Amino acid sequence: MKTYYEKDANVELLQGKTVAVVGYGSQGHAQAQNLRDSGVEVVVGVRPGKSYEVAKADGFEVMSVSEAVRTAQVVQMLLPDEQQAHVYKAEVEENLREGQMLLFSHGFNIHFGQINPPSYVDVAMVAPKSPGHLVRRVFQEGNGVPALVAVHQDATGTALHVALAYAKGVGCTRAGVIETTFQEETETDLFGEQAVLCGGVTALVKAGFETLTEGGYRPEIAYFECLHELKLIVDLMYEGGLTTMRHSISDTAEFGDYVTGSRIVTDETKKEMKRVLTEIQQGEFAKKWILENQAGRPTYNAMKKAEQNHQLEKVGAELREMMSWIHAPKELVKK
């Protein structure tokens, strides 16, 4: 595994250049501010709206996406996956020029052919492995979060060096930047989201909750046992892996882990995981998601509404009112 650190990167490669950060959401605001604090000239490219006003209030020169691309030598695309291809075709593509670098923090649109940059620009990825607020906070504390780096197209012969300079400007080389490919990052990221982190976990939590309530147990108790306490376990795993988690729980819980876990996640579950991975690798999921967006998201919206009306959500909202240490978000906005 090739990993790059501070000594391997030179942020001075960005001196005299302008970086355009396209999008000012979770990653956009963090990367733009970290770069600025590292002495890099940054402009923000967004359309008029809330993000435009926030970026302006944060002291950035804010302009249209097309103007930002014309101004910059490095263009970082930090819009949501489903918006990138449209914005690229409408405002980025015709303004690219020889020797520029087009950067991404997720490989979806490049890997699945939704964006096809011209051969005369560098195409690379710097993907911090933390949400934007943590990228910013850890940087301000003098540290950094790990990241991935990949080069898809090296027109200038310096793509990796410039990408590492960008990673250093964001603070990621302080922790370590692991070399990967657009294919590996994209396929593993989608699989992790679908099979484990989002799809797998939410299905497991709901199934456990429903099993208890259907068995006659009160929904409030089922919520505590199947969702609320999940954070306690995940935090232990996050801090020290499975061994630390198992060391920290009771022996009864640990024994139950060993003898029961494989009855829940069975060989059939793993076979289904492999089918999910194959669908991702063959582009079936990407095609489904692209078509879903083109159709106005009918399936997405229907499933989202149904999930929000699940008994688990209603019970959870009531119980969280008892938890003074939980600060509910004022507004649920996708960044």
Swiss-Prot record:
Pathway: Amino-acid biosynthesis; L-isoleucine biosynthesis; L-isoleucine from 2-oxobutanoate: step 2/4; Amino-acid biosynthesis; L-valine biosynthesis; L-valine from pyruvate: step 2/4. GO terms for cellular component: cytosol. Transmembrane segments: none annotated. Signal peptide: none annotated. Disulfide bonds: none annotated. Its cofactor is Mg(2+). Mg(2+) 2 binds at D189, E225, E229. The keyword Transcription regulation does not apply. Binds 2 magnesium ions per subunit. Involved in the biosynthesis of branched-chain amino acids (BCAA). Catalyzes an alkyl-migration followed by a ketol-acid reduction of (S)-2-acetolactate (S2AL) to yield (R)-2,3-dihydroxy-isovalerate. In the isomerase reaction, S2AL is rearranged via a Mg-dependent methyl migration to produce 3-hydroxy-3-methyl-2-ketobutyrate (HMKB). In the reductase reaction, this 2-ketoacid undergoes a metal-dependent reduction by NADPH to yield (R)-2,3-dihydroxy-isovalerate. This is Ketol-acid reductoisomerase (NADP(+)) 2. It comes from Bacillus cereus (strain ATCC 14579 / DSM 31 / CCUG 7414 / JCM 2152 / NBRC 15305 / NCIMB 9373 / NCTC 2599 / NRRL B-3711).
